[in-house]
């Protein structure tokens, strides 16, 4: 069984879903360094986008080394559905770009880091022509480590920072500690690194901090990653029809549920409800704002938000949700076993589970078939979905690094950003053939050494455009990408899509309590009126002033999506 070889960059939620890791708490203790543009009375925060960003961005040059079986469309990933042919692998980096220097990289790591001088690291360093030395840090406490390192005078050559670790003063520290890569990558300069030139422009825009191009991105599809999964085999067997409206879903849930027979319709469907009712994205705070009739509105202020919560509450109140869902997030266990056992037939989670659930059940439960419902509009019409960010993990180069080190880092990135179907991609993602993996019937299979050594390292320096490839389950790869394409066709970009925004520190925690209140409301522990009061309190505690701050940002910079 091959690991999930989708290279789509994760949001915090999808990364947690696929890696079962916990993000660190917000750390403090950093000096407030040079803030981004558009600051408010010294409180920090701001962005560079729209009019000013274009001159900073690298030129986009499509990579024609490999042709995907399914091209990207409507913000989807590219897809590959054929068997892997080692003999047919292409070369995307024909000569070593590295000059043989040493580069230290600090990165989050989940699990036990491999020894420094292992076969995978040696193979990668030899291919690139750079001696990469890893400073792996526990991903669960990474933000605290970042705070200490960025506050010190000793910063590694490269530091990887996921978007979910950019709390507190870290965005302003990024501006103060890391180099401007524009002189190496802006405009046509990027053509020296063809794989970096093939990274989508939206992903590069997310790399602008403090008015400079400072990051190297891990690109992602901008289509929602939350899929309403269902047991297609049981649906077919029972004759259930897929719902096309919120009312039809409720009726279907009633038909499915039989508590005496230990079968329920679903788990907590709140995330899907937000999509069904067209609620602005909650994946990152700036995405929750939208200009409506000249006024910026935050997602929690909308009628759609309340309607989505009320609809989800009704699912729970009617007893259609599995008892496990009543426990809430903190007590939830892995949904897989009970989904496989048919205790519930629908749940929503990250799109990566389309593959992982299929792979889990392939041998022991050959009749098992998972599929994803298309998101429907609550009233039976087309839904309105909102784009997620096109990159959310970044690598930064120290300001103190000499040009030779910057060039060596870019040499690393040009290899790690190689597309699927190349020798560079296979080495980056699977290691050395025969040492870390073998290919059986067109499917790469990692051995124990591969699973121990070839894990979340080089891919975090930079990655190719979002990619889905499952040679062991090509139908799943096709289904995932085609789902993204259909959902992408009804996806809109909100006012601050693609922008890298640091909110003023005094307001960064203002909306942190809404998620817990949502969960309490849908489970009947709180009322919709409690949310209305919380929104009123939010406005008074700074929400209205934050709105004014965002409006000035929009007036000064223009919308990123425009």
Task: Set out the residue ranges of the language-model regions.
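Helix-loop-helix "hinge/cap" segment bordering the ligand-binding cleft or interdomain interface
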Residues: 208-273, 289-332, 397-407, 414-423, ...
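Extracytoplasmic/periplasmic substrate-binding proteins
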Residues: 273-287, 313-454
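N-terminal secretory signal peptides
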Residues: 1-14, 23-31, 35
